[in-house]
Curated annotation (Swiss-Prot):
Subunit structure, as described in the record: Interacts (via BTB domain) with host CUL3.
Domain description: The BTB domain is responsible for the interaction with CUL3 while the Kelch repeat domains supposely serve to recruit the cellular substrates.
Main location: host cell
Kelch repeats: 305-352, 353-399, 401-463
Originating organism: Ectromelia virus (strain Moscow)
Keywords: Host cytoplasm, Host-virus interaction, Kelch repeat, Modulation of host E3 ubiquitin ligases by virus, Modulation of host ubiquitin pathway by virus, Repeat, Ubl conjugation pathway
CC annotations in GO: host cell cytoplasm
Transmembrane annotation, as ranges: none
Signal peptide residues on this chain, from the entry's feature table: none
BACK domain ranges (all copies): 128-223
The protein's name in its UniProt record: Kelch repeat and BTB domain-containing protein 2
CDD domains in alphabetical order: BTB_POZ_ZBTB_KLHL-like
Keyword Cell membrane tagged: no
PROSITE patterns per UniProt: BTB
Length: 559
């Protein structure tokens, strides 16, 4: 006699289910929730759960006619769903995370796998930190590791979300203390994550000490140390303040200095060189040369490693390659290339993110913006600038990237020997000032400068932005170096001209050093170092000496 297997299976399931529904031969009572009870059959539960199988076959339990099991620590609807699942009934996916937790406890492997698959399909950028919040204690199951990796990869944007603001301390600790080589954050960015969380959460003294111990305080950059010292929550706890003071900054690893990215005009090729310049001793030496001839690239510092991107050479009018140079070990590796070819542009760095903005792409001036998070495989595009611009001034202040002046039309190839020569700054120059909000991904227009300027130097100090630029003066048939100041707390006040002096050169390199603007420039093979005190408005000539054949392209602060 042939029997329809499907019909037979359905009949068996129906018969077993009717025993459950009618409370026939039930020999186990499960207590859930606020004392509610579920009756079931040991044989059915043991067949689907290793936990129940082990429990019901122990010598002390096996003699019981009716066994009681307490599962009140789990969501009662999740327990009901699991019992239905063990009786081969359809269950709801509404509380899949609660079901996953209970199924993992009861060692129901098939159900755990099904729940993991559902959670993986549901997990994305917007939900990952919420799901990790619910599952972080279950680090032994694969889906939790998957969700954690997604959180770690997207933390630069997640720290602004409500899910992060509401995260428990254990998640914060997990993020900052991770030893996963792919997602270990630089020390300064750990401070950013911690302070953002502290803005919305209470933390005990013991917890805060635990977090601080995960940060290499000695090798923090100056800005991050000041942020820790000035934080209200940290200053509430004397032991935390003492911990910071006892771990004074280690100045011996990387001395206070500048890295100058320069070219040597004694050679026809244009290989970028990294030269370390000590501001205090005014001594310098070359530490690395990139074995690619490029000029008019952009450079930046990320966690005391130098990034060089884009530029052009004799064969290519623009490039998209990106290099990372380790200063301490004097090594160079190639990072993922930018999406767009760029030259005459700038790199902005906020935490672990690098922003490539505008610039020139062949004969086109770009409006495009792209960003790269250290450790990622690719760059991604961001909202365009309001106008296409290259050869502008740039600085980072809080969450904003400020763009000042620049050139609105493309410029032809300039030999490296002429990079520091005076250019006609009235030719297609811009007086516009804009800033990019990296949190909300929007561009904002600010008050314009009084005149167009190309390649101005920009630095920030306290709440002010300073622009050092050369303005053409027809009365003297030459140029004047002007310093403008803009207060970021008063967007309507505009730019204030605070000083002017005669200048011989339009290419200036500035750095804020000891509450003064230090200006480095090169003229006729001489290096000139001037200092402007922003409190007294006084100029001081520090150095005037031979600089061999160096043409400096950029200055990068190293602390």
């Amino acid at each position: 006699m042939d029997i329809d297997d499907i019909k037979h299976n359905r009949r068996v399931v129906s018969n077993i289910s009717s025993l459950l529904d009618n409370d026939i031969l039930c020999d186990v009572i499960i207590t859930i929730g606020d004392g509610e009870e579920i009756k079931a059959h040991k044989t059915i539960l043991a067949a689907g759960s290793k936990y129940f199988r082990t429990l019901f076959t122990t010598p002390m339990i096996i003699r019981d006619l009716v066994t009681r099991v307490n599962l009140q620590m789990f969501d009662k609807d999740a327990v009901k769903n699991i019992v239905q699942y063990l009786y081969n009934r359809h269950i709801s996916s509404m509380n899949v995370i609660d079901v996953l937790k209970c199924a993992d406890y009861l060692l129901i492997d098939d159900l755990v796998t099904d729940c993991e698959s559902y959670v993986k399909d549901y997990t994305n950028h917007d939900t990952c930190i919420y799901i990790y919040h619910r599952l972080y204690e279950m680090s032994h199951i694969p889906i939790v590791k998957y969700v954690k990796r997604m959180v770690m990869r997207n933390i630069p944007t997640l720290i602004t979300t409500d899910a992060f603001k509401n995260a428990v301390f254990e998640i914060l600790l997990d993020i900052i203390s991770t030893n996963d080589g792919e997602y270990v954050y630089r020390e300064g960015y750990k401070v950013t994550i911690l302070l953002k969380w502290l803005d919305y959460n209470y933390i005990t003294e013991e917890q805060l000490l635990c977090i601080l111990s995960c940060i290499d305080i000695q090798n923090l950059d100056k800005k991050s140390r000041l942020l820790l010292y000035s934080n209200t929550t940290i200053n509430m706890y004397s032991s935390c303040v003492k911990f910071l003071l006892d771990n004074k900054q280690n100045r011996n690893i990387i001395p206070r200095q500048l890295c100058l990215v320069y070219h040597d005009t004694n050679y026809n090729i244009s290989n970028p060189c990294i030269l370390v310049y000590n501001i205090n001793t005014m001594e310098y030496n070359t530490i690395y040369t990139i074995h690619n001839n490029i000029i008019n690239y952009s450079s930046a510092v990320v966690d005391n490693e130098i990034i060089i991107a884009g530029g052009y050479n004799f064969n290519n009018i623009s490039l998209n390659k990106v290099y990372k140079i380790n200063i301490e070990h004097r090594t160079c590796v190639e990072l993922p290339p930018m999406i767009k070819n760029r030259c005459h542009f700038s790199l902005a760095v906020i935490d672990d993110m690098i922003y490539a903005i505008g610039g020139q792409n062949g004969t086109i001036v770009e409006r495009s913006v792209e960003c790269y998070t250290m450790g990622d495989d690719t760059w991604k595009m961001l909202p365009d600038m309001p106008d296409a611009i290259s050869s502008y001034g740039m600085c980072v202040f809080d969450q904003y990237i400020y763009i000042i002046g620049g050139r609105t039309e493309h410029v032809k190839y300039i030999p490296v020997q002429h990079m520091n020569e005076i250019v006609d700054i009235n030719e297609h120059s811009s007086d516009k000032v804009i800033r990019y909000d990296t949190v909300n991904n929007i561009w904002e227009k600010l008050p314009n400068l009084c005149s167009g300027t190309i390649r101005p130097s920009v630095v920030s100090h306290k709440d002010d932005i300073y622009v050092v630029c050369d303005i053409k003066d027809d009365e003297i048939n030459g140029f004047k170096t002007c310093i403008f100041r803009y207060n970021t707390k008063d967007n309507y006040k505009g730019w204030e001209l605070i000083t002017t002096i005669d200048s011989k050169l339009t290419v200036l390199h500035t750095i804020l050093h000891d509450d003064a603007i230090t200006i480095l420039h090169w003229y006729e093979s001489c290096m000139i170092q001037d200092k402007f005190n922003i409190d007294t408005y006084k100029w001081t000539n520090i150095c005037y000496q031979r600089s061999n054949s160096y043409i400096v392209h950029d200055t990068l602060p190293i602390y």
